[in-house]
């Protein structure tokens, strides 16, 4: 199966469906799923998704519904942030000057040799050498 790592910015755009990035997220991810692809996310993405959706809407139940939707998707697989991944993320955070959670997505992409889908411009610019980010056009 063709896989990619997807960060919270792309997940939120995909799940909410009405963000500025939603059309791009839908185009990329629906084409990926239609081609038999799957996505990998670190388990922290679940909390990031719930928080982003609930805060943006002001409705906690929408955040929880987004998590339920994510859990039911057969082509989305989570990975636990263990000591090894956390250590790699810490190294990336310090050397690339990226935020902590962003470093986790970059570390996962690097560790698994997978491309990363993100709408975070800084994260795309500061990705370590060898980490491919998926073009948005």
Model-found features: residue ranges?
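Short, well-structured N-terminal submotif of metal-dependent ribonuclease cores
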Residues: 1-41, 56-65
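Acidic, PIN/NYN-like endoribonuclease modules and their adjacent C-terminal/linker elements
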Residues: 3, 78-79, 106-137
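Short beta-strand scaffold positions
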Residues: 6, 40-41, 80, 100-103, ...
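Alpha-helix capping/helix-boundary segments
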Residues: 10, 45, 84-85, 105, ...
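Noncatalytic, solvent-exposed loop/strand surfaces
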Residues: 16, 23-28, 51-54, 64-66, ...
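Acidic catalytic patch
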Residues: 17, 43-44, 64-95
């Amino acid at each position: 199966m063709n896989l990619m790592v997807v960060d919270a910015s792309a997940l939120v755009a995909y799940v909410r469906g009405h963000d500025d990035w939603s059309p791009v997220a839908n185009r990329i991810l629906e084409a990926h799923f239609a081609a038999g692809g799957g996505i990998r996310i670190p388990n922290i993405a679940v909390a990031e998704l719930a928080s982003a959706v609930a805060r943006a809407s002001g409705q906690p139940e929408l955040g929880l519904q987004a998590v339920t939707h994510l859990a039911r998707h057969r082509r989305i697989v989570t990975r636990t942030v263990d000591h090894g991944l956390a250590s790699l993320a810490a190294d990336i955070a310090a050397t690339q000057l990226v935020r902590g959670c962003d470093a986790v997505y970059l570390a996962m992409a690097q560790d698994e040799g997978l491309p990363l889908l993100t709408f975070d411009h800084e994260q795309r610019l500061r990705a370590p050498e060898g980490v491919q980010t998926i073009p948005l056009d």
